[in-house]
Amino acid sequence: MSRQAWLLVAISGLYVGATALSNTFVNAYLWKLERKFATLGWFNLAQSVAMGLAFVTAGYLTNRCDRVWALRLGMLAHVAFYLTVLQLERHAPAYALPLGLLLGVGMGFFWFGYNVILFDVTDPENRDRFNGTNGLVMSAMGIVAPLVGGWLIGRETFAGYHWVFGLSLCIFALATVLSGLLRPRADADGFHLRPVWRASWSQHTRWHAVMVAMLLEGLREGVFAFLVGVLVVVATGSEWRLGLYATLSSLVSLASYGVVGRFVKPHRRRQAALVGSLLATASVLPLLAEVSFATLVVLGVGTAIAYPLFIVPVTSTAFDVIGAAPHAVRDRTEYVVMRELALNVGRVLSVAGFLLLVAWRETLTLLAAYLALTSSALVGAALWMGRSEPEWKAKE
């Protein structure tokens, strides 16, 4: 991989380290203050909506300046989010919607910049290696950060949350400085979203299959992003246990990403994604019998093994389809925007369903059933991604 690719790995590693330190506990923080699942739902719904809007805005701006600025603006928005949470203290749940919007803007800008730069610094020959290596680094950061966060919060509770959010600010600042080493690449060809939008709806295109797969993946991600961690706190009453849970999951995920990056080659992507999606869905089933720390650990370990099997081939295939499209280099930002819009539509639908569920009844059994239902969408995502007919299919 090139030096720019390794630099992107370092920046995303710092970003994931900061989010693993704080985002792991943000939903637990809101839960502890108000103990309402609906508050968490509105916070995450606002976050998903803002992410989609941020991607479109970032795509428009990137064609008038450099895509590195999207990365930086995303990290600066994270800094603003945590500063605001620190200022609001125990009043944070009352501002769940604006806080969710601010965090969503940060995530949208960062991941837009990351995905466009990923396309620029990789190619079909090294994309699987990059995604595997990046997954290893992210998992390594995910091992240490939640453990530190859980330990700090476990010692001092709400004061510990302040320490955790403050540390994240420092890490985001370091990542922002490091982004100055990324090579600029401005685009002056304008923002051509309409042709990519049409391709997304045209059922005979490979891109349509990618879009459906992304929407289905978003259905799973929307509720999993916050509910599992909160269930650990509900089941144990301990942020320290949540930190242990996240660390154990990341440790297993580290090994899984290593294996996937080494052995899952283009001609094995379809099978790997399908196996990963089935295993991820099966990992949720013990929760239907009982929501306890033990069954949540089964879910965490199972997902840590399965998700790299799913996400590495799916991500690589999506970018290969973009790379094979007409005007791929010119329109890469538009393809990234549409990909993330599909993901966020899935997330919004998932969280909206969660809000309807908790408005009707709040029971752990129903929440576990909803996790199982949304997780099964990964199987559909794997099957649809297989229909995208990537370039390696012709070589088999």
Where are these regions (language model features)?
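Hydrophobic core of transmembrane alpha-helices in multi-pass small-molecule transporters
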Residues: 13, 92-110, 215, 294-311
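Helix-to-loop junctions at the C-terminal end of transmembrane segments
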Residues: 54-67, 153, 256-269
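Intracellular juxtamembrane helix-capping segments at the cytosolic ends
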Residues: 109-123, 228, 308-327
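Glycine-rich segments within core transmembrane alpha-helices of 12-TM secondary carriers
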Residues: 129-150, 339-351
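Symmetry-related core transmembrane helices of the 12-TM Major Facilitator Superfamily/SLC fold
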Residues: 162-181, 365-384
